[in-house]
Amino acid sequence: MTNPSPKLTPMFEQYLRIKEDYPDALLFYRMGDFYELFFDDAETTARELQIALTCRNPNAELKAPMCGVPYHAVEGYISQLLDKGYRVAICEQIEDPKEAKGLVKRAVTRVLTPGTVIDDANLDAKEHNYLGALFWNQDAEAGAFAWVDVSTGEWSGLYSRKLAELWQWAQKMAPRELLLPEGVDTPAMATLGTTQTVRVPARSHFDLKSGTERVMRAQGVADLGSLGLEGKPELVRACAALLAYLAQTQKQELSHLAPFKPLNLGRHLIIDEVTERNLELFHRLDGRKGPGTLWHILDRTLTPMGGRLLEERMHHPWREASPIRETQQVVEWLFQDDVRREALRTALDLVYDLERLSTRIFLNRATPKDFIALRQSLSALPAVRATLERPANPEGTYPTDAETSGDTLPKPLSDMLSAWDDLADYADLLRRALTDNPPHLVTEGGLFRPGFDPDLDELLDLAEHGEARLQELLAEEQTVSGLPKLKLGYNRVFGYFFELSRAGADSVPEHFVRRQTLANAERFTTERLKELEEKLVSATDRRKTLEYRLFQSLRDTVAEARPRVLFMADMLAHLDFWQSLADVARRNGWVRPDVHTGHDIVIREGRHPVVEAMQGSASFVPNDLRMDEKRRLLLITGPNMAGKSTVLRQTAIICLLAQMGAFVPAREASIGIADRIFSRVGASDNLAQGQSTFMVEMMETARILRQASKRSLVILDEIGRGTSTFDGMALAWAVVEELTRRAGGGIRTLFATHYHEITSLEGRIPGVHNMNIAIREWNGDIVFLRRLVPGPADKSYGIEVARLAGVPHSVVQRARELLADLERTRDAARGTNSAPSRQTLPGLDLPSKQEQVDTIVAPPPCSGVEHPLLVALRDIDTDDMTPLEALKRITEWKQLWGTTREDRS
């Protein structure tokens, strides 16, 4: 910071004293209607926000760089700074400037950080905003990772004896901030993306004894067993670190957190961060959100709570059949009734973010606009309920189950209706209390409706009709006192007064008190005039004070309803989640899959939902796929661009959707529940950690081989391509063998490869089955049929794909020559060996005698450019040629032969 002159004003002394306690935060210092920043903070903020940088006291010894933002618009500016990774300390005036003796007292009331914000301006409505804490006990070889969304009060965590697993979850949950004990480094394997790591003192944040007390106090429990934390000291420490950090930044103990619920991994399908990225669940491979992701396809939610529940279910699909089938029942019920579903969508569209609204109200951070949003949301609850209830008969009665025959509510919905709470008492209170368009700030007044509070009504009447009340009093005195010439006046010295001429002053009644004598007039006051004047002068201030007190009382009353509000918010979130799945299924022609506890996966005419949406359903080619005990590992071959990766990804996505309880993009599907989905798809590297593409590939492969079980689903694409041909093929081969040996019968695997030699494993290793993406050669071109068919591909067609990609003709031609040369060399080398080695890969067995003869009599490689006629002959498909086409082609060749002969001569 700039070294200031010793001569400081009281204001700067106060500023620097406060700033000293928050050296790592930008200090927003409240001065009237602005927040001002000084010195280095001002220069940083002006640069990041692109606002004017000025100077306070430019002619004094202490020249302080300064910038400022209006109080009423501060949220937007803070949001920009938080997105850039800055911390912001809010320093408020904690006493009324009118009552201050000297400098107004100020103090930091909260510290805003990326992981602790609760205002809508700083949050994505449909995404959780997590603060995380990771702790590892080296002595016990155990650790924990916990996370909390302060804006909703939800928090959870997990305990593990595997440090790598904890870091995987930290990457998957992607907290905005991750708390670590001081001295702990991020491992090389962890890629945290936009997550900021915050080192905090272990003794103050991760201490077990004080942390246990902190957790029990925050949760209002006498022991840890009710929270699922008994016997998990590392998880207690991680939770305690979260609470300590929140108390430090929020300047208050947060009692709004929901009961802690440890994540039960046994109930959920586990999808790690790598697989989420490879399947493009939330972000495209280029890191962007929006079109091109599964989230973009599935998100037809209308409420922020429903959107966050969808995100949660995509992160943690079910592993148990019961919740999957319950979800399917509701989705199917809504899927079949378009009218009811649209009515439900219309009603839900009126609901705001009840979870975050109730949090801000509970923490006294809500604005009047938040209460209006809550009122509108509560008012929509009866309409939402009505969409679920059976339609009434003209007589006003409801039909019985027998009469509706098939219209019976699924159990989750009937249970929901039996516990439904319209919160009518609070909706009515908010309707009676608040105006339709209250000001943004409580202190501006104009919050409450007439009739809500008698004292406020009187003050409002005075403020609005004060002049009329004065004229009424004047008219009354003129009549009662018999003084028709009595006048009413006002000046700043004496205030309001009655005035009479000197001649008429002798006849004033006794209750008139003389205030001033002028040359031609006398001025008087009365008790009633003084009382009315006092009311008028103080009416505005008293009104604002009373409105603020009423608002705080209203806030306290509404805050008591938070458990009821959160209960209904959870119901609405589930309704929104279910209708979103039903709406997506109806729009895209998806079907309800059969989800079972076996291991078979059967998909008929499966589609990739994202690719289909991008290309259009008319051009997308669906595919069948079957995995059972005889087909545990499918080896998929075919050229690049043929669609191997699409088949791999769509299979994993269909399984994920099925275990969410959603419908799937297929004509028919039967899915054996998986415990984990693993993927190794596409090229990636981690240059920051010095890890090459091949190293990352091998690390991910190693993790799959260590963690996959018989119930897992593994998709592997091009294992071994990042190294030499024989190294890569050997590794791919060994991985296939290992996958078929593991878990007592092999792991369900889709394995795409260009190493055609590996396809010889079918028939040699039980469970291995060859499939390929069909193509067709036509008039020298290749046509991608995108169809998955049995058997291995006959060749890779890599050079043809290069030609289609626009590689120069000379390069393609030369590649063909080199390929032919390499193939002849390989065949000749095979002919020199008399017997195969025992270690020769089955796919590399020696050629037959006839193949050896063919090799011997093959012509030597040409040194020049290959004749165009030879290219045409080799590329022709005689099976699909008519006699007329053959004659036409021969004529063309004859002309071509003559042209080339003339060129040579």
Curated annotation (Swiss-Prot):
Superkingdom: Bacteria
One GO process term, biological-process aspect: mismatch repair
Pfam families, A to Z: MutS_I, MutS_II, MutS_III, MutS_IV, MutS_V
GO MF annotation: an example: mismatched DNA binding
Keyword annotations from UniProtKB, A to Z: ATP-binding, DNA damage, DNA repair, DNA-binding, Nucleotide-binding
Positions contributing to ATP binding: G638, P639, N640, M641, A642, G643, K644, S645
Protein name as it appears in the record: DNA mismatch repair protein MutS
Lineage, top ranks: Bacteria, Pseudomonadati, Thermodesulfobacteriota, Desulfovibrionia, Desulfovibrionales
PROSITE patterns: DNA_MISMATCH_REPAIR_2
Family classification: Belongs to the DNA mismatch repair MutS family.
InterPro entries: DNA_mismatch_repair_MutS (IPR005748), DNA_mismatch_repair_MutS-lik_N (IPR007695), DNA_mismatch_repair_MutS/MSH (IPR017261), DNA_mismatch_repair_MutS_C (IPR000432), DNA_mismatch_repair_MutS_clamp (IPR007861), DNA_mismatch_repair_MutS_core (IPR007696), DNA_mismatch_repair_MutS_N (IPR016151), DNA_mismatch_repair_MutS_sf (IPR036187)
Gene of this entry: mutS
Organism listed in the record: Nitratidesulfovibrio vulgaris (strain ATCC 29579 / DSM 644 / CCUG 34227 / NCIMB 8303 / VKM B-1760 / Hildenborough)
HAMAP family (UniProt xref): MutS
